[in-house]
């Protein structure tokens, strides 16, 4: 048996590596090949290309690398034609993976989407594409299963793979104690894992840090960098700010554990912050032109999610009855766990306001921690990789579905997985 993986994000590489290990534990004779990153390679995947090096954001960056993406899609198509795998597993990275799914369906290869793109948030009309191109949707979030099933997609909730990693993670406790034992409260700054995110977010976080420092002179700051190039860029910015900020590479879990509170880029890191129950302010910054575009077309885009942050979605009803307003300020204490700002402007004063309150009023920090503890008890369970691996192999080995439906047939023609298979 052979399974082809297509993964483009660093976080997807992590989850793909864990899933591959579980698949090979159950059946060591399976060949795992495809596109991914170093963690998938170390788990036993024969990489055709390190796709994580092309993890880009924004239309401009996509256009710059368009030829590279097209060559990789064509290469996958040739592989499907000459070495037909038994299944294709996609993780995140929708812009590229839709094309991989289309090629797989053209060759009648079953497609599994593990860690589906959040189309329910930003592009609900794309569920038609999901229905045509994907045979099995493995959902990370509890409300996703119902959302996809209501739209005639084969979907089952397996849990979020991020919690698998967090439960198995071993922290450097000596490093944590060393950081914590220095004088003054500690705020961790998490600007993101992509270069564009770091460049967009860090300047606003440092501006907020300056405001916090003026109110709480003993406060210290640490920046968690995903890679050395990010740390070098951050260090240049920090030197200009004249703030007490240290930068570390590959120490995100320890820095989160050691901090009193954090400011972070919107993304899956919010689940790690939930796991460690850290009060956090979330920034989702977008360029002005993109902000104007989204705001202008919001009615057409049916942009009805109430929040941008996963933890806030898990804490409340994720979908709004009316359109979500961009740039809204969540200043009501206790309304949501993580105050969030979706903006193209400067929200550093608002970000600082929350951090100052948490530092000056421990009871507010404790109230937020209790709220996070309650959410964690409900959703932060491991086992997603196990469930996903078992589901995929049961379908391929023990409960094979009918031949995959060509992508050009309508939703009424798509075969539904037997209920027994969905509940296993």
Each model region followed by its residue ranges:
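Nucleotide-activated sugar donor-binding and catalytic core shared by glycosyltransferases
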Residues: 1-424
């Amino acid at each position: 048996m052979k399974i082809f993986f297509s993964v483009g994000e660093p976080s997807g590489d992590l989850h793909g590596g864990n899933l591959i290990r579980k698949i090979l534990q159950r059946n060591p004779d399976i060949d795992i090949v495809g596109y991914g990153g170093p963690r998938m390679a170390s788990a036993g995947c024969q990489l055709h290309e390190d796709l994580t090096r092309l993890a880009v954001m924004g239309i401009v960056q996509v256009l710059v690398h368009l030829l590279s993406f097209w060559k990789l899609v064509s290469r996958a198509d040739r592989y499907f034609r000459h070495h037909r795998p038994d299944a294709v597993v996609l993780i995140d990275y929708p812009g590229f993976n839709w094309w991989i799914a289309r090629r797989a369906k053209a060759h009648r290869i079953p497609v599994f989407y593990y860690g589906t793109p959040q189309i329910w948030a930003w592009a609900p009309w794309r569920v038609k594409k999901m229905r045509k191109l994907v045979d099995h949707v493995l959902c990370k979030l509890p409300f996703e299963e119902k959302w996809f099933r209501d739209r005639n997609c084969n979907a089952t909730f397996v849990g979020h793979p991020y919690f698998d990693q967090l439960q198995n993670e071993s922290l450097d406790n000596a490093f944590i104690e060393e950081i914590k034992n220095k004088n003054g409260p500690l705020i961790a700054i998490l600007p993101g894992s992509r270069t564009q995110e770091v460049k967009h977010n860090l300047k606003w976080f440092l501006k907020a840090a300056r405001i916090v420092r003026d109110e709480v002179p003993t406060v210290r700051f640490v920046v968690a960098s995903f890679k050395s190039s990010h740390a070098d860029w951050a260090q240049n910015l920090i030197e200009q700010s004249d703030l007490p900020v240290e930068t570390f590479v590959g120490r995100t879990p320890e820095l989160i554990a050691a901090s009193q509170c954090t400011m972070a880029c919107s993304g899956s890191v919010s689940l790690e912050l939930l796991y460690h129950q850290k009060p956090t302010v979330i920034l989702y910054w977008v360029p002005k032109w993109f902000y104007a575009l989204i705001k202008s077309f919001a009615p057409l885009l049916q942009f009805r999610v109430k929040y941008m942050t996963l933890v806030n979605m898990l804490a409340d009803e994720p979908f709004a009855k009316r359109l979500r307003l961009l740039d809204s300020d969540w200043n009501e204490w206790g309304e949501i766990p993580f105050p969030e700002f979706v903006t193209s402007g400067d929200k550093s004063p608002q970000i600082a306001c929350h951090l100052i309150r948490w530092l000056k009023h421990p009871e507010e920090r404790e109230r937020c921690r209790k709220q996070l503890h309650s959410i964690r008890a409900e959703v932060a369970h491991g086992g997603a990789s196990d469930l996903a691996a078992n589901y995929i192999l049961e379908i391929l080995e023990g409960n094979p579905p009918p031949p995959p439906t060509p992508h050009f047939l309508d939703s009424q023609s798509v075969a539904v997985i037997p209920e027994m298979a969905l509940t296993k």
